[in-house]
Amino acid sequence: MDFSTHRLTTLLLLLLATVALGNAQSSQLTVDSHDITVLLNSNETFLVFANGLLDSDVEVALGTDSEDHLLLDPATFVYPAGSTRNQSVVITGLKAGNVKVVADSDDANKEIVKDVFVRVTVAKSRALIYTSIIFGWVYFVAWSVSFYPQIWSNYRRKSVEGLNFDFLALNIVGFTLYSMFNCGLYFIEDLQNEYEVRYPLGVNPVMLNDVVFSLHAMFATCITILQCFFYQRAQQRVSFIAYGILAIFAVVVVVSAGLAGGSVIHWLDFLYYCSYVKLTITIIKYVPQALMNYRRKSTSGWSIGNILLDFTGGTLSMLQMILNAHNYDDWVSIFGDPTKFGLGLFSVLFDVFFMLQHYVFYRHSRESSSSDLTTVTDVQNRTNESPPPSEVTTEKY
């Protein structure tokens, strides 16, 4: 073997050794599922395995952030070097609640076991779990459909009189920002990675149904706004107060985007600021419509179907939160961070107020405004029938 051949062989061996060492060092332990639900006094199993060959034995110690909620068997084990076997760990639910199971090891192997964690939910009843799922789907459908009674009413009347334009302006901005937040966290990997860095044991809060709902809500609101350009609207317009509020929101969004673009804050923070604007809009967006109904002493032109569906969705959403809090003994999710529950309650209270306006306060005005139940086509048909002048009705829009 000449010198050049010997040198080439040596280089190849060094390269193979480097690759093997790199693979060994990059190999980690992980689990087959990071989220598990177990019933009280029942068992569930998760598996620990290596995503490559380890170059040394790794001692793993499993711990929880709440010792009295569940039992782990085994709580400690050694994962052997070069093994591809699965290590089974049995979880026994002892007390309802949300528990995080995390792994620890010696300093040399902490990086290897960092992906060994499980979010465990100990539930009291499987029936309550299924009931919660049903509630979730029903309120998702109710909220999604709630946009269409107003669209249909506008189309049927060929008029948007009675529908407040400030409400529409706030709504389209709110749902646009909500869509940005959901799409960003669901589709953009850089934002997902940043979220994982900040909340290593957390789960992405945005799911596919959130993305679908927000985009659909934005689309339906755009349809309603387009109707305002083509149908009778009298002297209605967006108020200067609404323009001022929207200008403030625009400054917040633009400044936040500039800070994110200049790397002063992360783009994830920009999305959070957008979500805060959306929450603010949720609180105030119904006020202009309620005031308009009060000044007109009528709900004509404002679809009660929208309110009834929104009330159904909001009520079921709160019931689901209460149901889950009971099933998982997690009342802190409501009383410790009341934002979500409070916003749902606030919206439902507004729905109740609108129902009182429609069915109680301005009931006689609604009954006398029969034009809301008559389409332009009906008017044309009756005109074509050439009835006597005394039988011709006057339509109000």
Curated annotation (Swiss-Prot):
Keywords: Glycoprotein, Lysosome, Membrane, Repeat, Signal, Symport, Transmembrane, Transmembrane helix, Transport. GO terms for cellular component: lysosomal membrane. Residues 25-126, 189-210, 261-263, 324-340 are lumenal. Cystine/H(+) symporter that mediates export of cystine, the oxidized dimer of cysteine, from lysosomes. Involved in cysteine homeostasis during periods of fasting, which indirectly regulates mTORC1-mediated signaling by supporting de novo CoA synthesis, the TCA cycle and amino acid metabolism during periods of food shortage. Important for maintaining autophagy, and for development and survival during periods of fasting. One of its GO terms (molecular function) is L-cystine transmembrane transporter activity. SMART domains: CTNS. Disruption phenotype: No effect on adult lifespan but larvae show a developmental delay. The larval developmental delay is more severe when raised on a low-protein diet and adults die more quickly of starvation. Accumulation of cystine in larvae. Under fed conditions no difference in larval cysteine levels, however cysteine levels are reduced in fasting larvae. Conditional RNAi-mediated knockdown in the fat body causes a developmental delay when on a low-protein diet. Residues 132-187, 271-327 form the PQ-loop domain. Its main location: membrane. The lineage of its organism: Eukaryota, Metazoa, Ecdysozoa, Arthropoda, Hexapoda. Residues 1-24 form the signal peptide. Residues 373-397 are annotated as: Disordered. InterPro entries: LC_transporter, PQ-loop_rpt, TonB_box_CS. This is Cystinosin.
